[in-house]
A protein has these predicted regions:
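Membrane-interfacial amphipathic/re-entrant helices at transmembrane-helix boundaries
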Residues: 1-27, 55, 63-68, 140-141
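Membrane-embedded helix boundary and interhelical linker motif in transport proteins
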Residues: 35-90, 133-140, 242, 269
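Short loop segments and helix-boundary regions at transmembrane helix junctions
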Residues: 36-41, 82-125, 214-218, 230-251
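Alpha-helical transmembrane segments within multi-pass membrane transporters and channels
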Residues: 64-104, 109, 149-152, 255-256, ...
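Helix-loop-helix "hairpin" substructures at the membrane interface of multi-pass membrane proteins
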Residues: 80, 140-225
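Transmembrane helix-bundle core of multi-pass membrane transporters
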Residues: 95, 99, 103-163, 193, ...
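Cytosolic-side transmembrane-helix boundaries in multi-pass membrane proteins
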Residues: 175-182, 186-189, 248-251, 261-313
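Transmembrane alpha-helical segments in multi-pass inner-membrane proteins
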Residues: 202, 206-278
């Protein structure tokens, strides 16, 4: 009976979970660009997510319009990806280590931007684009509606961009760097550009989350890479058989983030210890990452052996 009583509270919490999932889904799309397209494990996102939130909040507190604050936050995120890309390509530092170095530096930079560990912003005093307060309202300014529109714009722009010659060059760089260089493609430039675009999206997500929750925190991006990977993997696991178009693959990542946050909300509603959420997330990501390896190791060989036996017969 206690479980049923707790589950009765779940519908009231679902709008908030969906809104958060959509916001983090934009960040997950950024992770998808580096993880699946560039084939680079970029850990900058844990820092650039907070940078987007910090820059957006400080711009709003200084009197800047929200429509001007968001592009500034996006440019700040783009700059963080640019730094990681240059550390990797120009200085020869491995991509993972380059991301860690940038992430570490961004902790101090985010502190310097805000002047302290966190900065709050009041929805009554500032014209925010989204807010937690409106999540259950049936109106255009509902965060769910606004972020769906933002996600649609992001997916549309990325679909167009990766269909251009430059975008195809980035995809080719991630798919086969050696062949791309042989075709005269500047792979270093494409890696830097891909990382910059990815972290620009991550910063946009951070800027939206800071408005939604009403504050920016220096540690708000901690564990973002795990959430991003979880969204990518869940989206692929659920929709990979039916979503083959590039735009639909990006949409599946966003839906994966929503599923992730709904599951998290369900687990919390059932009384799971909130202190163990990061452990749960890491375990889920580890298992899903291992599934392709397990499939190849334990399920492919018997099929090949059966085919060989049939040929010999």
């Amino acid at each position: 009976m206690e479980i049923i009583a707790r589950l009765a509270n779940l519908p009231g919490a679902l709008p908030g979970a969906c809104a958060q999932g959509l916001i983090w889904g934009i960040m997950a799309i950024g992770v998808y660009l580096t993880y699946r397209i560039l084939d680079v494990a970029d850990l900058t996102v844990d820092g650039s997510f907070g940078t987007g939130g910090a820059v957006c909040v400080m711009c709003l507190l200084s009197g800047m319009n929200v429509w001007a604050a968001l592009p500034v936050a996006v440019l700040a995120g783009l700059a963080t990806g640019l730094v990681t890309g240059l550390l990797h390509t120009f200085m020869g530092i491995p991509a993972i280590l380059a991301g860690i170095l940038t992430q570490l530096a961004l902790y101090s930079i985010n502190l310097k931007i805000m002047g302290k560990a966190n900065q709050s912003i009041n929805v009554d005093k500032y014209g925010l684009l989204i807010s937690l307060r409106w999540v259950k309202e049936f109106a255009l300014h509902n965060p769910i509606i606004m972020v769906i529109l933002a996600t649609a714009v992001v997916i549309g722009v990325l679909y167009w961009f990766f269909g251009t010659e430059l975008g195809c060059g980035i995809r080719a760089t991630g798919s086969n760097p050696a062949m791309s260089r042989a075709q005269g493609i500047n792979t270093n430039f494409n890696i830097v550009l891909g990382l910059a675009v990815s972290n620009a999206l991550v910063a946009l997500s951070g800027a939206l989350l800071s408005q939604y929750q009403g504050f920016a925190d220096v540690g708000m991006g901690r564990g973002a890479i795990v959430i991003g990977l979880a969204a990518v993997i869940i989206g692929e696991a659920v929709f990979s058989r039916i979503f083959h178009n590039f735009a639909l693959k990006l949409a599946s990542v966003s839906i994966g983030a929503i599923i992730y946050y709904i599951v998290i909300q369900l687990v919390l509603t059932l009384g799971f210890d909130a202190n163990l959420l990061k452990l749960l997330s890491a375990s889920v990501v580890a298992v899903f990452l291992a599934v392709p390896y397990w499939k190849g190791k334990y399920f492919s060989k018997p099929v090949k052996k059966a085919k060989e036996d049939a040929k010999n017969a």
